[in-house]
Curated annotation (Swiss-Prot):
The keyword Endoplasmic reticulum applies. It comes from the Eukaryota. It is found in: Microsome; Endoplasmic reticulum. Disulfide bonds: none annotated. The keyword Endoplasmic reticulum applies. Signal peptide: none annotated. It comes from Scyliorhinus canicula. One of its GO terms (cellular component) is endoplasmic reticulum. This is 13.2 kDa protein. Its main location: other. Keywords: Endoplasmic reticulum, Microsome.
């Protein structure tokens, strides 16, 4: 799970 701007907008692996 990778959070870019603290949001769940840019999550990889999910």
């Amino acid at each position: 799970m990778i959070f870019t701007a603290x949001d769940r907008s840019a999550i990889e692996x999910v």
